[in-house]
Amino acid sequence: MAFRKENKIKSNFSKISIGLASPEEILENSSGEVLKPETINYRTYKPERDGLFCERIFGPIKDYECHCGKYKRIRYKGIVCDRCGVEVTEKKVRRERMGHIQLVVPVAHIWYFRSLPNKIGYLLGLPTKKLDSIIYYERYVVIQPGVKAEDGIAEFDLLSEEEYLDILDTLPKDNQYLEDTDPNKFIAKMGAEAIYDLLARLDLDALSYELRHRAGNDASQQRKNEALKRLQVVESFRASRGRNKPEWMIVRIVPVIPPELRPLVPLDGGRFATSDLNDLYRRVIIRNNRLKRLIEIKAPEVILRNEKRMLQESVDSLFDNSRKSSAVKTDANRPLKSLSDSLKGKQGRFRQNLLGKRVDYSARSVIVVGPELRMHECGIPKLMAAELYKPFIIRKLIERGIVKTVKSAKKIVDRKEPVIWDILEHVMKGHPVLLNRAPTLHRLGIQAFQPKMIEGKAIQLHPLACTAFNADFDGDQMAVHLPLSNEAVLEAQMLMLASHNILNPANGAPITVPSQDMVLGLYYITKLRKGAKGEGLTFYGPEEALIAYNEGKVDIHAPVKVIVKDLDENGNIVDVMRETSVGRVIVNEIVPPEVGYINTIISKKSLRDIISAVIKACGVARTADFLDGIKNLGYKMAFQGGLSFNLGDIIIPKEKETLVQRGYEEVEQVINNYNMGFITNNERYNQVIDIWTHVNSELSNILMKTISSDDQGFNSVYMMLDSGARGSKEQIRQLSGMRGLMAKPQKAGAEGGQIIENPILSNFKEGLSVLEYFISTHGARKGLADTALKTADAGYLTRRLVDVSHDVIINEEDCGTLRGLVCTDLKNNDEVIATLYERILGRVSVHDIIHPQTGELLVAGGEEITEDIAKKIQESPIESVEIRSVLTCESKKGVCAKCYGRNLATNHMVQKGEAVGVIAAQSIGEPGTQLTLRTFHAGGTAANIAANASIVAKNNARLEFEELRTVDIVDETGEAAKVVVGRLAEVRFIDVNTGIVLSTHNVPYGSTLYVADGEVVEKGKLIAKWDPFNAVIITEATGKIEFEGVIENVTYKIESDEATGLREIIIIESKDKTKVPSAHILTEDGDLIRTYNLPVGGHVVIENGQKVKAGEVIVKIPRAVGKAGDITGGLPRVTELFEARNPSNPAVVSEIDGEVTMGKVKRGNREIIVTSKTGEVKKYLVPLSKQILVQENDYVRAGTPLSDGATTPADILAIKGPTAVQEYIVNEVQDVYRLQGVKINDKHFEIIVRQMMRKVTIDEPGDTRFLEQQVVDKLEFMEENDRIWGKKVVVDAGDSENLKAGQIVTARKLRDENSMLKRRDLKPVEVRDAVAATSTQILQGITRAALQTSSFMSAASFQETTKVLNEAAINGKIDKLEGMKENVICGHLIPAGTGLREFDKIIVGSKEEYDRILANKKTVLDYNEVE
């Protein structure tokens, strides 16, 4: 009898390292060698000995029973049977014991020569093709040339069979009997053995030195890059000193995973269901055994070689079957699932089993509404509760002595005997449950409720909780989970209770806002009706008013006067007389007095503000009660008012006829113009669309007036709309106005929707014609189809966001940074999009802010800007405030509380441990799905806003122009005017008295200007106007036109219009890049004055030889046709920004300030040269197909686009620096969400952008351990530079024995060494200062950033699992388990919130438990103190 050791891993580890396994390690972890390919005996169903399921190796199949049955039962535990060699133990060891297969010949590991970057190839400097031919036994490789070196044969040479045999023939006789270490011996081998020898012979230090030299000195960029790539692999092996050896990439022993992880289950009928891995292992074993036998019988080399190659292939497919070109398939032609495949993807180990586990104590059912529940309650069906709380009931049954054993208690519960209901009531008190609705898009998708037992089988949900869950009662299901431990119960009660989650973490607005019926009821009773019964009465208090109402003396809507409690200016509660209505008095019975008297009509918007005010004034608990009161009142009043609508409430305005008629007339006019040839087809189309858009919006306005004045605004449809209960202006317009313009169906992948120019003139009340109906349905169905497709994209975006930001946690109070972001009002042209108040609220100021007029200190540096302070700042003349931001936070891990500011879900400063990264990701991802789901509500109606085409003075002001260049013309009315020909013209409106700049506008190129610089204008004066449909090119000189390179069907095509017979010249992209269409302007004598390039797509409106005056249009370029604003712009745009992708047509941007000169045309590109005042010259090539936005002699600033197109974030980063690009991304993404009406606080975007900017790339490595072009963490970079700061590098070691050239030493060590040498009169050490590394900030897309995180576990569970693990293993990476994902994977508490490591010592439980623990601790503590 022998005993075996047990080695268990402790679960409280703090880091995980990964590396290559050495053959010794594999042997150490193995419990025995698998020799036979057999699995189990098909008759007895017992495992075969030495096979893949052998009990001797992996442990017994039944608990405490050996194979032959000699030892049974637990008393023989640990004994190894002398007959069958099986250890008597539990059967679960079959889940953890490994075996191994000893291979006859080594094989290469497929991860390290098949996947890119090819590690073995880089180490040996061999290309993949050559490597393959060695590994798969096609070529010999010379490992040591020996005596053949003089014949020009070098190491790493490949030899074919013949060459190899020739060389063997010419070798001296005794050569093959020399020792392998003898430098004269010629050695060449093939297969993985050869690679093994080559890798084992590598001297990494020498190789590293040589490659560094090559990378530093090679002139050719390609060879330099090659050296750098190899260097990275070499350095990673050197860095993991001895933990990883290169030759371990060659496998000599294949580990066999435990049998329970690759089960084999007998089905009925003598068939077996098996894991694919068994097949793969069997092939390896069969081939290995066959090779053994062939070697024993001394088979010819050819046969052996073939068998070796097959062995290599079988091990390849075991490790990674998907990498191979010819994957091993089953009979059903399905590729087998190899070890790598079981890690990858959504169904792989990481995402399926480690990050997403199924849990016990959970239930799921349909939800129904529970209007009588309190805010923190939910209704749980009796049967469900009995099952969920089963163990608790059993415990109580035994405690109360109703039963003696657990078994009998179980029976009672299963039979649902009446005694258990009473116990269940008791157990459920103070033991909340968690409700969750999939998809859980943000943290409000899981909330805790106090359960109430109900009859029936459906879960009851509080109506106000629906918004957060995005639930409705049309058959949605929800899952219930039960928190078990004391800690979990406490967290559920304190942090997750629904009545505590009233605010939305994305923007701080209340999320439990009553909707639909509730809003309608409140709106109805707070609306006033002139001439109602009892109008004008006066009451001495709310009570009297209510009595009068109940007695029927006064109508609920009648305007009356009542003395009520309200707030005065200082916020004290006083009695005042207010003109109000009984309805409003009833509402104010519920409103807490601290908020004052609400004397307005209540809509959904105002309700949200009231709830915010209640939270600020009274705290969360009172707000929950208030919400319950509001809910009850709202439902009651909506029911009492009988607020439904009938067909008569949908009123069609009588002006509709005339409006439509007028539209037709205008369209007729446009078509006439087109037929006469005054306008192009494109212009006609744009104008028609414009006309109908105007008609539609005018009709909408009239409709709104009509419907709102109907029955004093008590029209049911109008009330639903106005209160915000249901419906939108769009929808009502379609019910009783006209459906309007619809989007045109387009082919998949086509850019932006065109609009059908014939509008649908009918509305739904009149009914649509067949054609109209057809167009209508198309839009509606497209909306539904889009939704389904986009939801997946939104989910994937959320996943990437979470992955990039999950390790951002508040880790300290204050990082002490002095930097911040400057915040101002966010404006677009002239209209304020986000006020300074919104942007600084809840942030922390960097400096003291002092009121410029009164000199009072508004807020000290490092203090939170509260509502009051923000209001004061907004009202003062202060334009900008520098605030702390996550983007400038200098915390080493996570971010600090001061830089983050206020936690939006609580309205207090954020606490340490808050998982702000995940909150940010959820806040951005959750509306992503909303964005996508928003398309179809208008039923595919085209939202097209007519472009404005003029600048009109909004105030009386003085004008100042900048960069203005004009030419004088006479416009079509005969007035003198100027045409702007500069691209950078700006006009500033300046207040005549104060000199403050009121607004700035860009004056577009080609606009007609009606004022002069410095002129003072009245409000409403037209400053400039331009053609909204076409971009133009205007001549600045008078003369004769001469075309060059304008050749029919090469650089232009003629489009003749069938309708008008007019012909237009349209420039097309020519295949022949030497032909550049351009127009020269010549003087009378034929001297060249100016040349204009004609851009692709331009319509030429003049003829060759024509005389032109300055200011005339030469070319019109139709602007993109009015596109239907659909979210299709939304989500892809957000993705594009977060992935830092370059847009499809990037603009060419100037990197310096300077003057523009046009260069030659090179290969279809126009050269633009920018010369700065300092004489620096930059050349840019712009494709001729693009319109060039600058002209000869223009002065441009750095960052100005030279051609049309979108600016790329990379350019902004390179030219304007990190801050500019951070603000650009935040603002651009915000724009997309704003367009959809989604409010998200800036700080969430800032967190994501911070994660995108974590890395720098090394320009000059200096004396640091970095390599050129290496991408490293900013922090790591700074630490490494600090490490070598002030140290010296040995240039010449002199006579020193301790130091050698190239070593980095401290000044002190150097001094000691040199003084010692000096005393002994030896040559001193020569040194130079250590050079620090330099770097450039880079911007990474979220996917790249998530894959480059410091934690390999997090990266591997995200994407490209095998590649990440492969890299990590070679680098011998260590995961410190700092983020959330890693800890979830390891089954630890997450390092955020209550899981912060500093809270480890907190114990939640009853007093008795605490005392017991203390008693146990005391003995330990005394012992520790002695130490």
UniProtKB/Swiss-Prot annotation:
InterPro entries: DNA-dir_RpoC_beta_prime, DNA-dir_RpoC_beta_prime_bact, RNA_pol_asu, RNA_pol_N, RNA_pol_Rpb1_1, RNA_pol_Rpb1_3, RNA_pol_Rpb1_3_sf, RNA_pol_Rpb1_4. It is an enzyme of class 2 (transferase). Its cofactor is Mg(2+); Zn(2+). Pfam families: RNA_pol_Rpb1_1, RNA_pol_Rpb1_2, RNA_pol_Rpb1_3, RNA_pol_Rpb1_4, RNA_pol_Rpb1_5. Its EC number is 2.7.7.6. Zn(2+) 2 binds at C815, C889, C896, C899. Binds 1 Mg(2+) ion per subunit. Keywords: DNA-directed RNA polymerase, Magnesium, Metal-binding, Nucleotidyltransferase, Transcription, Transferase, Zinc. GO terms for molecular function: DNA binding; DNA-directed RNA polymerase activity; magnesium ion binding; zinc ion binding. It catalyses: RNA(n) + a ribonucleoside 5'-triphosphate = RNA(n+1) + diphosphate. GO terms for cellular component: DNA-directed RNA polymerase complex. One of its GO terms (biological process) is DNA-templated transcription. Zn(2+) 1 binds at C66, C68, C81, C84. Mg(2+) binds at D472, D474, D476. DNA-dependent RNA polymerase catalyzes the transcription of DNA into RNA using the four ribonucleoside triphosphates as substrates. Belongs to the RNA polymerase beta' chain family. The RNAP catalytic core consists of 2 alpha, 1 beta, 1 beta' and 1 omega subunit. When a sigma factor is associated with the core the holoenzyme is formed, which can initiate transcription. This is DNA-directed RNA polymerase subunit beta'. It comes from Bacteroides fragilis (strain ATCC 25285 / DSM 2151 / CCUG 4856 / JCM 11019 / LMG 10263 / NCTC 9343 / Onslow / VPI 2553 / EN-2). The lineage of its organism: Bacteria, Pseudomonadati, Bacteroidota, Bacteroidia, Bacteroidales.
